[in-house]
């Protein structure tokens, strides 16, 4: 079993028996009902994440990726700075189970937060503020930045480096690709616009035809209605004529029977 396996096993055992630790259970209960503890824990997590990203930026060789990470760090710093007043309001609220000394310590923690947030490296020209004075020896930590004896940049600083050249080329390539994509989108929109215009013109041409069809349908409906009325009248006339003929035939039969009976009885 390796050392890592042993440490993992010990950690799992410690977590298993944490529920029997009275102090930890008390802290967990306090933080569960304490908005300050939750928010301050979120601050700590975001600050640690930002510091880790800042450390990754120093090791990042891709200039574009480093710029993107620095921008994300600056957004995180701005968001944290906006949330500091809320944390200050929560720090002065009394919480059950906390002493006066602990409340004072919370206020001190909140007062130290702006400096901690500002100290996070974000790739800006000024960088994090420092209380120490600038000396010529302070430039040794950044050998790629050189200062004159008067504190001004020398000519070597403004020369284009390989990283800046690569970043410029990558930026130009992405800009060209973006312009090509926008051109394709513009062409597609123009094609859709032309199709819509053609469809509109075709609909305009179809409107008179539809009106004419509606007129003809109305006329045919009226003619069919009149034809039905005339046909009904004709049928009624035929029925009346047929009934008259049947009545005459029946009358003749009745008269014949009467004449026969008269002759027989006579």
UniProtKB/Swiss-Prot annotation:
UniProt domain t-SNARE coiled-coil homology: residue ranges: 172-234
An example Gene Ontology CC term for this record: cytosol
PROSITE patterns: SYNTAXIN (PS00914), T_SNARE (PS50192)
Stretches with biased composition (Low complexity): 130-141
Annotated spans, Disordered: 122-146
Membrane side Vesicular: residue ranges: 265-266
Sequence intervals crossing the membrane: 244-264
Coiled-coil regions, chain positions: 44-87
Any Gene Ontology biological process: protein targeting to membrane
Protein's membrane topology: Single-pass type IV membrane protein
Keywords: Coiled coil, Membrane, Phosphoprotein, Protein transport, Transmembrane, Transmembrane helix, Transport
Pfam families cross-referenced by the UniProt entry: SNARE (PF05739)
Subcellular location: Membrane
UniProt superkingdom: Eukaryota
Phosphoserine modification, residue list: 12
Gene3D superfamilies with a match to the protein in the record: 1.20.5.110
GO molecular function, one term: SNAP receptor activity
Family: Belongs to the syntaxin family.
Subunit (UniProt): Part of the t-SNARE complex.
Function in brief: Vesicle trafficking protein that functions in the secretory pathway.
Protein name: Syntaxin-71
Organism: Arabidopsis thaliana (Mouse-ear cress)
Organism taxonomic ancestry: Eukaryota, Viridiplantae, Streptophyta, Embryophyta, Tracheophyta
């Amino acid at each position: 079993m390796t050392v890592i396996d042993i440490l993992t096993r010990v950690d799992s055992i410690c977590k298993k028996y944490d529920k029997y630790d009275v102090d930890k259970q008390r802290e967990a209960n306090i933080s569960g009902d304490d908005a300050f503890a939750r928010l301050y824990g979120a601050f700590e997590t975001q600050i640690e994440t930002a510091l880790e990203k800042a450390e990754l930026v120093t090791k990042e060789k891709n200039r574009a990726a480093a710029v993107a990470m620095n921008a994300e760090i600056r957004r995180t710093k701005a968001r944290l700075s906006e949330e500091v007043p809320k944390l200050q309001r929560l720090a002065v609220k009394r919480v059950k189970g906390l002493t006066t000394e602990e409340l004072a310590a919370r206020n001190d923690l909140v007062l130290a937060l702006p400096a901690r947030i500002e100290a996070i490296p974000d790739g800006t020209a000024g960088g994090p503020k420092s209380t120490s004075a600038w000396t010529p020896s302070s430039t040794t930590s950044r050998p790629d930045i050189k200062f004159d004896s008067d504190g001004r940049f020398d000519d070597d600083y403004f020369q284009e480096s390989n990283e800046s050249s690569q970043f410029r080329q990558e930026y130009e390539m992405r800009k060209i690709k973006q312009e090509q994509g926008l051109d394709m989108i513009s062409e597609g929109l123009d094609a859709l616009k032309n199709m819509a215009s053609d469809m509109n013109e075709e609909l305009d041409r179809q409107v008179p035809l539809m009106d004419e069809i509606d007129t003809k349908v109305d006329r045919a409906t009226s003619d069919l209605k009149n034809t039905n009325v005339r046909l009904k009248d004709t049928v009624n006339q035929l029925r009346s004529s047929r009934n008259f003929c049947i009545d005459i035939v029946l009358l003749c039969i009745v008269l014949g029977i009467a004449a026969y009976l008269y002759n027989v009885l006579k």
